[in-house]
Every structure is written in C-alpha cells, then in structure tokens.
Amino acid sequence: MMRSMHARRGATALLLSGLAGLLTACGTMQSPNPPSAMPAPVAELAPTARLRAAINFGNPILAVRDAAGQPSGLSVDLARELGKRLGVPVELVTFTSAGRVVEAVKNSEVDIAFVAIDPVRGADMLQTPPYVIIEGAYLVKNDSPIRRNEEVDRPGNRIVVGNGSAYDLYLTRELKAAKLVKAPTSPAVTDVFMAQGMEVAAGVKQQLQADATRLPGLRLLDGRFMVIQQAMGLPKGREAGARYVSAFVEEMKASGFVDASLKRHRVEGALVAPPAR
C-alpha cells in the first residue's frame, strides 16, 4: 500500500513537472507585438507602428531640402531621434505650409509635428514646451517711408503673410489698422509682396533676409515684431504621448542636441528655448 501511494505521488509530481515545463515553454515563445500591445507612449505616438512626422518646408529654420532633394534640418533631426528612442521607423510627411500641417495633426494624418505655440492651434492639438524661439520680421522696399516696426500698423498698409502661419495668426489678432493679404505659403510671401505692390511682407527673419539678398531694392526693418515659440504638436487624445515628447524636448535642449543641430545646419535667427518651468 505504501508502495502504491509513493507511485501515485511520483506520477503526480512527474505530471506537474511536465505541465510546468510546458507552461514555461509557452511563456517564452516569441511573437510580434501589434501596436495595441506596445507600451502606452509608443502606442500613442506610433499607432501604425511607425512615427509619421510632419515636416514643413514653409519654415527654413526647421526644414529644407538638401543637395539630394531629401528633407534636412532641425525638425528632421528631432523626428529621427524620437523614432530611435521609441524603436520605430520614421516616416517624413512633407508639407509646404503650417496651415496644412495643423490640419494634418487635427485629422491624425501625422503623429508629431513642429509648429509654433499659438492659442488657435492649441485648440486642435496637444503641444510641448518650446525647443527654439524664432524672430518674426518685416520686409519693405528701399524707398518705403516705413522705418520702424511700430509704423507698420497704419491705415493703408497691406501686410503679406503666409496663410495659416504663426505670423498670420498673431497679426490677425493684433492688427488695428493695417490689412492682411495672405500668400499661399510662407516662402511665397515676398514674391506676392513684389508682384502685387504691397507695402510690407512679414515672416521668418531668416527667410526674409534671404529674399532681400535674392531680390534687389528690399530691406528689413530693424529688430523684430514678435518672437515665435516653436514646439512639437500631437493629435488630441494622446496625453501619455504628449508627456513623453515634452520630456524628450527638455532633454534635447539640455543635452545640447538642439543647439548642435542648429549649428550643423547653419541656421541663424533661432535660439534654443529656455527650460520649461
């Protein structure tokens, strides 16, 4: 009888051991994780298992095309670094205007974007603290009577801005007497300004400086009329992702990544934003 009990115990132990081994083997089997099984920030930032980054060629401080025609610049560097941190491939989705970028974020056509902080845009997306600050400037013809920024907002003055740009949004709120005329994109501002005989062009200082070099008879007004805080934006509803990207932005500023990228791409007219409070 004792031998029978020992035999049953041995068989039970053997069976349990076999089951444990089977469960362990099953637990260590590897299978691809779908996006829904990823950690929360990755699932929110890359719901298609790739990071779709909006790159706006309308702002040359953030993005240009290199000699091979490929996207290059600070925003491209940041997008690729974020993709590396998340362990997902990066898809660069290119645009020619900030207004179109905002629409793409609003419609979740992209996962991250590089846009100016503005209360109007903030209604349609989540935004991080700024990573750079950019100066906005005015351009006039050499024979213009306008000499100071304070003289621009006067009756009879027509100011050309890129449709949907940060300057458009800002001046729409602030102007009292001058009239806004909207070019289709920011890079087209000076050409519209010249072709239609307007009084003032407004935009990124660096872009306008390049236009003044390209076209004769133009000058920039001294100083700046506004400072743009450039941030990263995400579609609404991705709060965990926004917290992750906000921390990423702060690290990129503190580590010198942003400053090094600006210098590598020979960008002038932009400064690394101070730490968020």
Where do the PLM segments sit?
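Extended ligand-binding regions for polar small-molecule ligands
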Residues: 27-29, 35-36, 73-85, 143-144, ...
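Short loop->beta-strand "edge-of-pocket" segments that line small-molecule binding or catalytic clefts
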Residues: 51-55, 150-166, 179-181
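Short beta-strand-to-loop elements that line the ligand-binding cleft
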Residues: 89-97, 161, 178-186
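Extracytoplasmic small-molecule ligand-binding "clamshell" domains
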Residues: 34-116, 255, 264
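Acidic, polar ligand-binding/catalytic clefts
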Residues: 76, 80, 84, 89-153, ...
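A ligand-binding cleft/hinge motif common to bilobed small-molecule-binding domains
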Residues: 99, 116-124, 170-173, 194-226
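Periplasmic-binding protein-like
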Residues: 57, 133-143, 205, 209-250, ...
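C-terminal motif of bacterial Sec signal peptides marking the signal peptidase cleavage site
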Residues: 22-25
